[in-house]
Amino acid sequence: MNWPAIERVESKRVVLDPLTVQHAPEMLPVLADPSIYEFIGGTPPTLEQLHRLYGVQSLGHSDDNAQWWLNWVVCLRRPRRAVGYMQATVERRAGVLEANIAWVISPAFQGRGLATEATASMIVWLTASGVDRYVAYIHPDHAASAAIARKQGLRPTSVVEDGEVRWQNE
């Protein structure tokens, strides 16, 4: 499938900038807080790891073109500052475009509704790009992410993968 190019997405307080390798230095301090990894696993990345990861993620699609990879850096509008990231992996399933979405906001900026605003903006853009179904995998103890998903119209299902509950909009 020929996927459209990722675009910049703007909302009232945040801008979603399409991810590039050049974002790595700016994202390093955003991802440095170990508490980010409490529910998602892993450890804070090094600059070299971010360069490699962003090199792959910014390609925009899988080698076989079956998946559309969308990654944005979430930035405050004023002052312009990176505070997190948004992700969507889109693929066709049973004739429907399904986006597996995820979000991370630096703990220093959590509790302000930024993830909710950024996620809503991403979903509007994805819907305009033809996506029909949204799913997110959320740790059952991660109340903040569950609240964000619920505000986007996602509901928990009985499906559990790797200890995370599948949420979806249908």
Which residues are covered by each model-predicted region?
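Conserved G/P- and acidic residue-centered "switch" motifs that form tight phosphate/ATP-binding loops
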Residues: 80, 113, 142
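GNAT-family acyltransferases
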Residues: 1-108, 121, 125, 129, ...
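Internal amphipathic alpha-helical segments of the cytochrome P450 catalytic fold
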Residues: 37, 111, 145-146
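Primarily hydrophobic membrane-targeting regions of prokaryotic envelope proteins
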Residues: 111-114, 119
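Conserved active-site alpha-helix within GNAT-family acetyltransferase domains
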Residues: 116, 141-157
